[in-house]
Amino acid sequence: MAYRDQPLGELALSIPRASALFRQYDMDYCCGGKQTLARAATRHDVDIDIIEAQLAQLAEQPIEKDWRAVPLADIIDHIVVRYHDRHREQLPELILQATKVERVHADKPNVPRGLTKYLTALHEELSSHMMKEEQILFPMIKQGMGRQATGPISVMESEHDEAGELVDVIKHVTQNVTPPPEACTTWKAMYNGINEMIDDLMEHISLENNVLFPRALAGE
């Protein structure tokens, strides 16, 4: 099956582990989920035939859960527990680790300078963002007022883009979250945590941008 003309967001939802494959190629399937596979492959200099073959292989596996068929209230409850609560745990710990690494290894050329600042900015951005969703947008959607939520949803999508930009900066200062040979245990653990946080955040944003918000605006 040809996947090149399909949006990344749709492919991430319909093919098991496609999201992990897109992350491997540094393709943005959450905020950039409307771009086609062909366009993303061109932008990242990826052979379209190779990635299509990889997706075809993944598509043979059963999908764990098709969120496109799950009631909106259940999706919201899942987002809060699986992603919002998790981000609230992840980021403070990562900030502590980054503070230590930047202080202890200040003289190392590969130290991720500014990482603490950017993680703190992401934490503040997401804390405000998630609170607005939980207090304003999610109750509207649960009450069947999704059609009237155009304004709040537009703001949330814009804030998703801002979070994505901060993630790009974090990836830049960490050499794409790759620890150097001299990295200590804390440094390596922090990078593992950052990679996990980025995976979670991309899944989180994709579920909202590509499933929850469109269905809410359609009046479900």
From Swiss-Prot:
Source domain of life: Bacteria
Locations listed in the record: Cytoplasm
GO CC list: cytoplasm
InterPro entries xrefs: FeS-repair_YftE, Hemerythrin-like, RIC_family
GO BP term, example: response to oxidative stress
Molecular functions (GO terms): metal ion binding
PANTHER family assigned to the protein according to its UniProt record, in alphabetical order: IRON-SULFUR CLUSTER REPAIR PROTEIN YTFE (PTHR36438:SF1)
Subunit organization: Homodimer.
Entry's family note: Belongs to the RIC family. YtfE subfamily.
Protein name: Iron-sulfur cluster repair protein YtfE
Organism: Salmonella choleraesuis (strain SC-B67)
